[in-house]
Amino acid sequence: MPLAQIKEREGMKRKIILIKSFCLIVAMAIGFGQPSAEKEELVLHFGYGSNMSESYMRQYTPSLKYVMNAQLPNFEIQFRKYSNNMGGGISSIIEKPGGMVYGVMYYITKKEMDELDILEDVPLGIYKRETFQVLGEDGKWYEADLYRVTEPKGPYEPAKKYLDIMISGATEHNINKNWLKKLKLMRAKYD
């Protein structure tokens, strides 16, 4: 066999080894081949109140990954739960034909979402986690979990501290400008 063919064949073998090595590294990086029990199950969460704020949420759900902005048609945000900790009303969603709730979608591990249930008083029956169809900014519909008050009361004046967190989240994710303006007007009452 001519020397040129031998060198060409050795070069091809090296390329094949490099490609296989690269594929193996990529497969390991994305978790290919791991037992399914080791892979974290993710929950798609729609945050519309204080849960719009990524910095606020990250305190409780470090796995949080922002997906995109989204909206929930035919509902509106109302402050239907009084919070002693916040000193005023905190949000829930109430059905309203033609209404719109603006928020964000995050992926959160199931384990952290279950822990968030405790923070949101789900075991006490104050809030409940439900799955809704929300419209992503990409024009597609998604099933996402959200929290809403089980037995709405009030409405109450929104808590100043709570509005600050909502405004922070809405600003952080460039949520609908008219909604942000409305939140800022509510907040201005405290200045």
Model-derived segments and spans:
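Glycine-aromatic micro-motifs
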Residues: 32-191
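Short, Lys/Arg-enriched N-terminal segments with co-localized hydrophobic residues
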Residues: 1-11
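Detector for intrinsically disordered, low-structure N-terminal pre-sequences
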Residues: 3, 24-25, 174
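Bacterial N-terminal signal peptides
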Residues: 20-31
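Intrinsic disorder/low-complexity segments
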Residues: 6, 21-22, 35
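Bacterial N-terminal signal peptides that target proteins for export
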Residues: 12-22
